[in-house]
């Protein structure tokens, strides 16, 4: 038997506290959806203790983005801040029902943030080997984020540049 390190014990403690916060849901802050499960991801970076909560699908061929949260803890494992990273849950098919018309890309919009966020990228990387689409776009008022799942590459354009490119493409057709 091996004894857990202090960091491992801290990770366990904040994860357990996050699970308790969610399932007590005293203020109705967290939202629950059918055929989904919550995944708790504790992190300690540069002394900051955080738990990300992602909503996973329990249905084959469905990728969930959204209904995700960030909980921040102090050194004594007390919750200091909780934040919704997306307002809603979006569900994307991993593969088309029609082999003649595969899904090549997916997209969603951001209201709360300007660019793609870490939970979007985490989810896309987790599912990249199970989906047929190669790119995911996140569109906000100021920016368009383009994440290439195959290359694991992110490009962020201003919305103005994106709109210019779209107009140019329209003229070419």
Language-model-detected regions and their locations in the chain:
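Surface-exposed beta-strand edges and flanking loops
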Residues: 42, 53-56, 73, 83-84, ...
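Active-site-proximal loop/helix of nucleotide/amide-processing enzymes and allied scaffolds
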Residues: 1-13, 17-20, 28-46, 91-173
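Short helix-loop boundary/capping segments
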Residues: 57-60, 66-94
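Exposed beta-strand-loop-beta-strand "reactive/processing" segments of non-cytosolic proteins
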Residues: 28-71
């Amino acid at each position: 038997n091996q004894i857990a390190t202090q960091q491992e014990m801290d990770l366990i403690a904040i994860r357990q506290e996050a699970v308790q916060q969610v399932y007590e849901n005293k203020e109705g802050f967290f939202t629950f959806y059918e055929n989904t499960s919550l995944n708790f991801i504790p992190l300690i970076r540069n002394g900051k203790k955080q738990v990300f909560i992602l909503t996973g699908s329990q249905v084959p061929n469905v990728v969930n983005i959204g209904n995700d949260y960030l909980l921040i803890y102090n050194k004594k494992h007390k919750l200091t801040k909780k934040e919704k990273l997306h307002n809603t849950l979006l569900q994307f098919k991993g593969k088309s029902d029609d082999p003649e018309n595969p899904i090549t890309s997916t997209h969603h919009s951001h209201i709360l943030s300007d660019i793609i966020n870490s939970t979007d990228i985490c989810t896309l990387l987790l599912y990249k080997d199970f989906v047929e689409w190669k790119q995911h776009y996140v569109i906000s008022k100021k920016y368009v984020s383009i994440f290439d799942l195959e290359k694991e590459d992110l490009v962020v354009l201003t919305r103005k540049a994106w709109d210019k490119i779209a107009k140019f493409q329209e003229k070419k057709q």
